[in-house]
Amino acid sequence: MSSSMECSEFVGSRRFTGKKPSFSQTCSRLSQYLKENGSFGDLSLGMACKPDVNGTLGNSRQPTTTMSLFPCEASNMDSMVQDVKPTNLFPRQPSFSSSSSSLPKEDVLKMTQTTRSVKPESQTAPLTIFYAGQVIVFNDFSAEKAKEVINLASKGTANSLAKNQTDIRSNIATIANQVPHPRKTTTQEPIQSSPTPLTELPIARRASLHRFLEKRKDRVTSKAPYQLCDPAKASSNPQTTGNMSWLGLAAEI
């Protein structure tokens, strides 16, 4: 009743004054109304569904139906859905464990024995060998034989290297024994430097050596600071001076 009284007063005041209330006044009145009533009341305007006594809805809802606006496309889609089949993008590969789990133990043992007994087929291929300046070609040569050849070649090279090393060491030892020690040679075999005498030289060589010595003597005397006599004249007339000396003519000359 109080709310109806307030509403009537509010309407009457608007009629008498002719002025609109302010926003603050409306807010204050709305807050007072909420404090008194606690809620806005029934604002559903009769659109809410009222439940029956048994707990079921009063107005039972009918099931909704979809309308196909594009019937042609719908039929195509249905056919496509029917045709689609699930594809296994990652197929599970059968493993030995899965097969062995399903098989009995005897079959599993047989399978393992057969797999062990089966040997890989020997593959053949052409083979070329270069040895001692020759080229040897085999058209069909198995891998096992090739391995044997390689092993033999490796053993042969190892043996040849060992022999070469032993030969080199023996040669070095013999050379070291042949070379004399320098200290022993100096003491045992003194150096004998004997100059060859002039008598052993041939006559022609000895005459040329005398001429060379005479010329050298003349050059030495000519380069002296002063000369007592002309060496050319002295060498040309030695006998005349000796013969004339006893006659007392040496002073005049």
From Swiss-Prot:
InterPro entries: CCT_CS, TIFY/JAZ, Tify_dom. It is found in: Nucleus; Cell membrane. SMART domains: TIFY (SM00979). A motif (Jas) lies at residues 202-227. GO terms for cellular component: nucleus; plasma membrane. Keywords: Acetylation, Cell membrane, Host-virus interaction, Jasmonic acid signaling pathway, Membrane, Nucleus, Plant defense, Transcription, Transcription regulation, Ubl conjugation. Pfam families: Jas_motif (PF09425), tify (PF06200). The keyword Acetylation applies. (Microbial infection) Acetylated by Pseudomonas syringae HopZ1a. Ubiquitinated. Targeted for degradation by the SCF(COI1) E3 ubiquitin ligase-proteasome pathway during jasmonate signaling. Belongs to the TIFY/JAZ family. Homo- and heterodimer. Interacts with TIFY10B/JAZ2, TIFY6B/JAZ3, TIFY6A/JAZ4, TIFY11A/JAZ5, TIFY11B/JAZ6, TIFY5A/JAZ8, TIFY7/JAZ9, TIFY9/JAZ10, TIFY3A/JAZ11 and TIFY3B/JAZ12. Interacts with COI1, MYC2, MYC3, MYC4, MYB21 and MYB24. Interacts (via tify domain) with AFPH2/NINJA. (Microbial infection) Interacts with the pathogenic Pseudomonas syringae HopZ1a protein. This is Protein TIFY 10A.
